[in-house]
């Protein structure tokens, strides 16, 4: 589709993994995203999700799979602008879960088009690969993670036995990627997506509710949000959810090391400041 800017195109966001441009149009604003190779799957994935879930994914004007370009309509206001209200997640999470359930049918297609594979069966190997990297942790902490290797494999086996279908896992589901417009909540920025255990999506959501909103781990909101998210999946999944969050915390670290591998050396120090936080959250999950 051809669009004609009516003013200067401005850079809104420039990172090693993507550049985003603000494009003024006669009918409003569009957003152009050029993805780096590590996230080259995002334009096609976003377009496919929008085609199937137009009421919960931001509208795609067009995309170029070969060049990893994506053009989106203006999505509204991120809920971060309102302070990350838990009420927004209470409404959004069941709808996101329905999307995940529906996308389970398309897992093989997503994998074939480059969406990273973090299915539970491959996580033990991905964890071992993580530990082969030079990590921004002290020697004792790295040894704790290494010692945990056989236990992590056991936990993955336990989680797989619960029988939840693996599917799209956004892996960056926080207040800057959930937008409100016309009383609709839509998810965007699918560049961190993997095929993995669906429940692990809430690792990031819950982390930001703790860090940004200051909710303690035992706050009743976490139980309410968990139950709202699980409702489309069925009853009796509380224990499965807890196990998926534990395993998913390590899977999230594995996803981050994949991103880190594609960074230029000069960008790693800034990246590692957050990567260290993610690794420490994983360390906290090594205790039974």
Language-model segments: residues:
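Active-site acidic catalytic loop and adjacent metal/ATP-binding pocket
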Residues: 10-26, 31-32, 60, 153-202
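An alpha-helical support segment within catalytic cores of ATP-dependent transferases
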Residues: 1-4, 105-115, 119-170, 181, ...
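A glycine-centered beta->alpha junction motif in the catalytic cores
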Residues: 27, 71-85, 101-105, 125-136, ...
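ATP-binding pocket architecture of kinase catalytic cores
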Residues: 10-13, 17-118, 129
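Active-site activation/catalytic loop segments of kinase-like enzymes and analogous catalytic loops
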Residues: 185, 198-234, 246-265
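Alpha-helical scaffolds flanking conserved acidic
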Residues: 239-247
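Hydrophobic core segments within long, regular secondary-structure runs in both alpha-
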Residues: 146-149, 153, 222-230, 272-283
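Regulatory N- and C-terminal appendages and interdomain linkers associated
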Residues: 1-10, 42, 258-288
